[in-house]
Design a protein with these regions (language model features):
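Sec-dependent bacterial lipoprotein signal peptides
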Residues: 1-19
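Short, hydrophobic/aromatic-rich segments at coil-to-beta transitions
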Residues: 41-48, 67-73, 146-151, 185-189
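Extended lipid/amphipathic-ligand handling interfaces
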Residues: 33-38, 60-68, 89-91, 95-98, ...
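Hydrophobic lipid-interacting interfaces of membrane-associated proteins
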Residues: 49-56, 77-81, 96, 103-105, ...
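An acidic-aromatic
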Residues: 63-126
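Flexible, processing/modification-adjacent segments and terminal tails
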Residues: 102-161, 168
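N-terminal leader/targeting segments and the immediate start of mature chains
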Residues: 15-69, 220-235
Protein backbone atom coordinates (compact mmCIF):
# COMPACT_ATOMS: atom_id res chain seq x y z
CA UNK A 1 0.00 0.00 0.00
CA UNK A 2 2.86 2.39 0.84
CA UNK A 3 4.45 1.69 -2.54
CA UNK A 4 1.18 2.47 -4.31
CA UNK A 5 0.80 5.73 -2.37
CA UNK A 6 4.42 6.61 -3.14
CA UNK A 7 3.86 6.05 -6.86
CA UNK A 8 0.65 8.10 -6.82
CA UNK A 9 2.31 10.96 -4.93
CA UNK A 10 5.33 10.87 -7.23
CA UNK A 11 3.14 11.04 -10.33
CA UNK A 12 1.06 13.84 -8.79
CA UNK A 13 4.11 15.91 -7.90
CA UNK A 14 5.66 15.31 -11.31
CA UNK A 15 2.52 16.53 -13.05
CA UNK A 16 2.36 19.63 -10.85
CA UNK A 17 6.02 20.43 -11.39
CA UNK A 18 5.60 20.01 -15.11
CA UNK A 19 2.61 22.33 -15.02
CA UNK A 20 4.53 25.00 -13.12
CA UNK A 21 7.71 24.80 -15.17
CA UNK A 22 8.22 27.19 -18.06
CA UNK A 23 7.37 25.73 -21.45
CA UNK A 24 9.61 26.27 -24.42
CA UNK A 25 8.92 25.67 -28.11
CA UNK A 26 12.10 25.72 -30.15
CA UNK A 27 10.17 26.01 -33.42
CA UNK A 28 8.63 29.27 -32.20
CA UNK A 29 12.05 30.56 -31.16
CA UNK A 30 13.55 29.77 -34.56
CA UNK A 31 10.52 31.35 -36.26
CA UNK A 32 11.31 34.58 -34.41
CA UNK A 33 14.97 34.64 -35.46
CA UNK A 34 14.00 33.82 -39.05
CA UNK A 35 11.54 36.73 -39.00
CA UNK A 36 14.23 38.97 -37.49
CA UNK A 37 16.61 38.14 -40.33
CA UNK A 38 13.90 38.77 -42.93
CA UNK A 39 13.10 42.11 -41.29
CA UNK A 40 16.74 43.21 -41.25
CA UNK A 41 16.94 42.46 -44.98
CA UNK A 42 13.99 44.67 -45.93
CA UNK A 43 14.78 47.09 -48.75
CA UNK A 44 12.37 49.65 -47.37
CA UNK A 45 10.64 50.21 -44.06
CA UNK A 46 9.18 52.77 -41.70
CA UNK A 47 10.30 52.19 -38.12
CA UNK A 48 8.70 53.95 -35.17
CA UNK A 49 10.19 53.25 -31.79
CA UNK A 50 10.97 54.31 -28.27
CA UNK A 51 13.98 53.64 -26.09
CA UNK A 52 12.93 54.24 -22.50
CA UNK A 53 15.51 54.23 -19.71
CA UNK A 54 15.27 55.05 -16.04
CA UNK A 55 15.28 58.85 -16.37
CA UNK A 56 15.01 59.49 -20.11
CA UNK A 57 13.37 58.38 -23.34
CA UNK A 58 14.21 58.58 -27.03
CA UNK A 59 11.43 58.71 -29.62
CA UNK A 60 12.60 57.49 -33.02
CA UNK A 61 11.01 57.72 -36.45
CA UNK A 62 13.14 56.23 -39.22
CA UNK A 63 12.21 55.82 -42.88
CA UNK A 64 14.46 53.91 -45.25
CA UNK A 65 13.85 53.49 -48.98
CA UNK A 66 16.55 51.86 -51.10
CA UNK A 67 14.91 50.02 -53.95
CA UNK A 68 16.66 52.41 -56.32
CA UNK A 69 18.75 55.25 -54.88
CA UNK A 70 19.20 55.32 -51.11
CA UNK A 71 16.81 57.64 -49.29
CA UNK A 72 16.63 58.09 -45.52
CA UNK A 73 14.58 60.25 -43.21
CA UNK A 74 15.08 59.98 -39.46
CA UNK A 75 13.88 61.99 -36.51
CA UNK A 76 14.85 61.67 -32.85
CA UNK A 77 12.99 63.26 -29.96
CA UNK A 78 14.41 63.38 -26.45
CA UNK A 79 12.63 63.36 -23.11
CA UNK A 80 14.74 63.86 -19.98
CA UNK A 81 12.77 64.41 -16.81
CA UNK A 82 10.44 67.33 -17.51
CA UNK A 83 12.50 68.50 -20.49
CA UNK A 84 11.02 67.56 -23.88
CA UNK A 85 12.78 68.18 -27.20
CA UNK A 86 10.64 66.75 -30.01
CA UNK A 87 13.02 67.64 -32.84
CA UNK A 88 16.29 66.97 -31.10
CA UNK A 89 17.88 65.57 -34.26
CA UNK A 90 16.68 65.15 -37.86
CA UNK A 91 18.81 63.44 -40.50
CA UNK A 92 18.15 62.85 -44.19
CA UNK A 93 19.84 61.21 -47.18
CA UNK A 94 18.68 62.19 -50.66
CA UNK A 95 20.34 62.46 -54.09
CA UNK A 96 23.73 61.46 -52.70
CA UNK A 97 23.67 64.19 -50.06
CA UNK A 98 23.20 64.20 -46.30
CA UNK A 99 21.15 66.78 -44.43
CA UNK A 100 21.30 67.39 -40.69
CA UNK A 101 18.95 69.49 -38.58
CA UNK A 102 20.33 69.58 -35.05
CA UNK A 103 17.99 71.63 -32.87
CA UNK A 104 17.47 74.17 -35.65
CA UNK A 105 21.04 74.24 -36.97
CA UNK A 106 20.80 72.97 -40.56
CA UNK A 107 23.77 71.70 -42.56
CA UNK A 108 24.29 69.58 -45.66
CA UNK A 109 27.14 67.46 -46.98
CA UNK A 110 27.73 64.45 -49.24
CA UNK A 111 27.32 60.76 -48.45
CA UNK A 112 31.04 60.06 -48.95
CA UNK A 113 31.69 62.00 -45.73
CA UNK A 114 29.94 59.19 -43.82
CA UNK A 115 31.60 56.38 -45.77
CA UNK A 116 28.90 55.83 -48.38
CA UNK A 117 28.71 56.16 -52.14
CA UNK A 118 25.81 57.71 -54.01
CA UNK A 119 24.53 54.28 -55.04
CA UNK A 120 25.28 52.61 -51.68
CA UNK A 121 22.74 50.46 -49.90
CA UNK A 122 22.41 50.09 -46.14
CA UNK A 123 22.91 46.59 -44.75
CA UNK A 124 21.60 45.87 -41.27
CA UNK A 125 23.87 43.73 -39.10
CA UNK A 126 22.38 40.54 -37.68
CA UNK A 127 24.39 39.62 -34.54
CA UNK A 128 22.76 36.18 -34.37
CA UNK A 129 23.54 35.04 -37.90
CA UNK A 130 26.51 32.84 -36.97
CA UNK A 131 24.76 31.05 -34.09
CA UNK A 132 23.50 27.49 -34.49
CA UNK A 133 19.85 26.60 -33.93
CA UNK A 134 20.73 25.17 -30.52
CA UNK A 135 22.57 28.35 -29.53
CA UNK A 136 19.63 30.49 -30.64
CA UNK A 137 17.20 28.43 -28.58
CA UNK A 138 19.44 28.79 -25.52
CA UNK A 139 18.88 32.56 -25.60
CA UNK A 140 15.31 32.05 -24.33
CA UNK A 141 14.17 30.22 -21.20
CA UNK A 142 10.50 29.97 -22.17
CA UNK A 143 8.14 30.77 -25.02
CA UNK A 144 4.44 31.24 -25.64
CA UNK A 145 2.52 31.82 -28.86
CA UNK A 146 -0.95 33.30 -29.27
CA UNK A 147 -1.97 33.81 -32.91
CA UNK A 148 0.74 36.09 -34.37
CA UNK A 149 2.16 37.16 -31.00
CA UNK A 150 5.22 35.45 -29.51
CA UNK A 151 6.24 36.00 -25.88
CA UNK A 152 9.68 34.94 -24.68
CA UNK A 153 11.45 34.96 -21.35
CA UNK A 154 15.00 35.92 -22.23
CA UNK A 155 17.96 34.20 -20.60
CA UNK A 156 19.32 37.04 -18.46
CA UNK A 157 22.88 35.72 -18.34
CA UNK A 158 23.21 35.46 -22.12
CA UNK A 159 21.56 38.84 -22.73
CA UNK A 160 23.88 40.46 -20.18
CA UNK A 161 26.86 39.05 -22.08
CA UNK A 162 25.49 40.41 -25.36
CA UNK A 163 25.11 43.85 -23.76
CA UNK A 164 28.57 43.84 -22.18
CA UNK A 165 31.02 40.95 -22.47
CA UNK A 166 33.18 42.51 -19.75
CA UNK A 167 30.77 41.23 -17.11
CA UNK A 168 29.69 44.58 -15.69
CA UNK A 169 25.98 43.97 -16.41
CA UNK A 170 23.81 41.71 -14.25
CA UNK A 171 20.16 41.30 -15.24
CA UNK A 172 17.28 40.23 -13.03
CA UNK A 173 14.51 40.00 -15.61
CA UNK A 174 14.13 40.18 -19.39
CA UNK A 175 11.15 39.61 -21.68
CA UNK A 176 10.56 39.92 -25.41
CA UNK A 177 7.19 40.18 -27.13
CA UNK A 178 7.03 40.11 -30.94
CA UNK A 179 4.26 40.16 -33.51
CA UNK A 180 5.18 38.29 -36.68
CA UNK A 181 3.26 38.68 -39.93
CA UNK A 182 4.28 37.25 -43.31
CA UNK A 183 7.48 35.94 -41.68
CA UNK A 184 8.54 39.47 -40.72
CA UNK A 185 8.39 41.37 -37.42
CA UNK A 186 5.75 44.09 -37.35
CA UNK A 187 5.96 44.97 -33.65
CA UNK A 188 8.42 44.16 -30.88
CA UNK A 189 8.94 45.07 -27.21
CA UNK A 190 12.06 44.18 -25.21
CA UNK A 191 12.17 44.91 -21.47
CA UNK A 192 15.03 44.19 -19.09
CA UNK A 193 16.08 45.25 -15.59
CA UNK A 194 19.24 44.78 -13.56
CA UNK A 195 22.40 46.59 -12.52
CA UNK A 196 25.67 47.71 -14.05
CA UNK A 197 28.82 47.95 -11.94
CA UNK A 198 31.85 49.97 -13.02
CA UNK A 199 34.75 50.67 -10.65
CA UNK A 200 32.71 49.60 -7.58
CA UNK A 201 29.90 52.01 -8.51
CA UNK A 202 26.54 50.40 -9.32
CA UNK A 203 23.63 51.82 -11.29
CA UNK A 204 20.19 50.37 -11.83
CA UNK A 205 19.19 49.33 -15.34
CA UNK A 206 15.56 49.63 -16.41
CA UNK A 207 15.21 49.59 -20.19
CA UNK A 208 12.24 49.22 -22.52
CA UNK A 209 12.64 49.14 -26.30
CA UNK A 210 9.54 49.20 -28.50
CA UNK A 211 9.53 49.09 -32.31
CA UNK A 212 6.78 49.12 -34.91
CA UNK A 213 7.76 48.28 -38.49
CA UNK A 214 5.67 48.66 -41.62
CA UNK A 215 6.02 48.96 -45.38
CA UNK A 216 7.14 52.22 -46.94
CA UNK A 217 6.61 53.37 -50.52
CA UNK A 218 7.58 57.05 -50.43
CA UNK A 219 9.46 59.50 -48.19
CA UNK A 220 8.17 63.04 -47.82
CA UNK A 221 11.22 65.22 -47.28
CA UNK A 222 11.19 68.80 -45.91
CA UNK A 223 10.90 71.32 -48.75
CA UNK A 224 13.81 73.47 -47.54
CA UNK A 225 16.69 70.97 -47.85
CA UNK A 226 18.37 73.08 -50.56
CA UNK A 227 18.65 75.91 -48.05
CA UNK A 228 20.69 73.86 -45.56
CA UNK A 229 24.17 75.34 -45.09
CA UNK A 230 27.04 73.52 -46.80
CA UNK A 231 29.51 71.99 -44.36
CA UNK A 232 33.11 73.18 -44.50
CA UNK A 233 36.31 71.62 -43.16
CA UNK A 234 36.04 73.86 -40.12
CA UNK A 235 32.52 72.53 -39.38
Amino acid sequence: MKKILTIILTCFLSLNLAGCSASKNNDDILAFFNALDNTLNLKSAQINGTLAMKDSKLNIDAQILQKDELQVSSSIGLVAGKNVQNNFLNFYIKDGKTYLNSMGTKTQSTVDKIGLKKNSKLNAYNPFLDLTDDQLCELFDSSKKENDTYTFKVNTSKLATLLDNMGSVKLDHATLVATIKNKKISHMILNFTGTQTVDDASADIDVSIELSIKKLYKINFPNDLDNYKNETAED
